[in-house]
Amino acid sequence: MVTINTALCKNSTRVMILGSGELGKEIAIECQRLGIEVISVDSYSNAPAMHVSHRHHVIDMLNPKEIKRCINLEHPDFIVPEIEAISTNALIELEKNGYNIVPSAKTIHITMNRKLIRVLVSKKLNILTSEYQFASSFDELKIKTKVIGYPCLIKPIMSSSGKGQSVIYNEKELRHSWEKSQTYGRTSLGEVIIEKIIPFDFEITLLVVNSVDGMHFCLPIGHRQEKGDYQESWQPHKMDNVIFEKAKKISKKIVSYLGGYGIFGVEFFIYKDKVIFSEISPRPHDTGMVTLISQNLSEFALHVRSFLKLPIGKIRQYGPSSSVVICGNELYGNKISFSNIECINTNQQIRIFSKPNIKGYRRLGVILDQDETIERSLRKAKKTASKILIKT
């Protein structure tokens, strides 16, 4: 029997969210709907999830001492990482001391490190990936890129949202790419992964829910990125059912090995009849924002239900839906305002993230849309997003 103790009472059920961005905000809202006490944590003040939490803390998320101090102060029942920039060694130690890490400290540790997850998937689980090499110095990078060939993609082994990544076409670009990876990676580990750029027809995110009543799959989500950063997504993505079943089978194999209750976002490249593994996130995925309008249970509701050990049942998808980001570009300041919001059409919704400032470019919200076809839905959502006026 699952018991939830009311927030702010002496015996309250507490969830601590490590990372308080727009994804953490939606997780916090789902917890609030269930009367759970929410504590959000991030490295900066006034992060989105902090607006809808009972309490918050601002700490260095990569400092294991600060992570442990914060958690031992609050004694949460569930610790829910929402970002990559976290001391995973601290989480492993905390789990050994009895804390419940979602989905598990081992899973967080493996999936936040591109080297660990790529070797696991390709070598241990024998799943198809793009060709890759690793390098921990500039001299080694020069050698390994010759093995992979040009063009290739260079990424820090720990980063997200395209940070520190670059596509290089010749040896002259190596120095800049290496320096970028060292500057913008999430930690100072220094190591990078070099990936062969492969042809593909499209890429998808497959949301997989591991729960007490089995493993559940959302319909495939298509998405478009720029410089590794999500711009728009849609559900369902049209694809051959045989290929979809193959993606589900691969996802199940990976998630079953990793273990733990929660939602996983598995990214694939699809080329002809090949399903090629790209990455996996053990938490709600930014491309999954579309599920706020496309499903009876969003990815955030699914995540919370699963780690609380509540049954998921049947996930219903409502038809062609899309999500398009509202971006601030070449803007600076901490007084962000949005106008012309009344341009939103029927069957559309808006989410404004409430990020406290902007320094050049930043995702600040999304337009959610439903229509008879994906093409119509995307077209409408992009048109509406372009009409939202942002000032600082």
UniProtKB/Swiss-Prot annotation:
Q: Which reaction does it catalyse?
A: N(1)-(5-phospho-beta-D-ribosyl)glycinamide + formate + ATP = N(2)-formyl-N(1)-(5-phospho-beta-D-ribosyl)glycinamide + ADP + phosphate + H(+)
Q: What pathway does this protein act in? A: Purine metabolism; IMP biosynthesis via de novo pathway; N(2)-formyl-N(1)-(5-phospho-D-ribosyl)glycinamide from N(1)-(5-phospho-D-ribosyl)glycinamide (formate route): step 1/1
Molecular function per GO:
ATP binding; magnesium ion binding; phosphoribosylglycinamide formyltransferase 2 activity; phosphoribosylglycinamide formyltransferase activity
Supply the InterPro entries for this chain.
ATP-grasp, ATP-grasp_carboxylate-amine, ATP_grasp_subdomain_1, PreATP-grasp_dom_sf, PurT, PurT/PurK_preATP-grasp, PurT_C
Pinpoint the ATP-grasp domain residues: 119-308
**This enzyme's EC code(s):** 6.3.1.21
Q: Which UniProt keywords apply?
A: ATP-binding, Ligase, Magnesium, Metal-binding, Nucleotide-binding, Purine biosynthesis
Query: Is Metal-binding one of the keywords UniProt gives this record?
Result: yes
Which family is annotated? Answer: Belongs to the PurK/PurT family.
Q: Share what the entry says about its subunit structure, partners included.
A: Homodimer.
Under what name is this protein listed? Answer: Formate-dependent phosphoribosylglycinamide formyltransferase
Organism for this UniProt entry: Wigglesworthia glossinidia brevipalpis
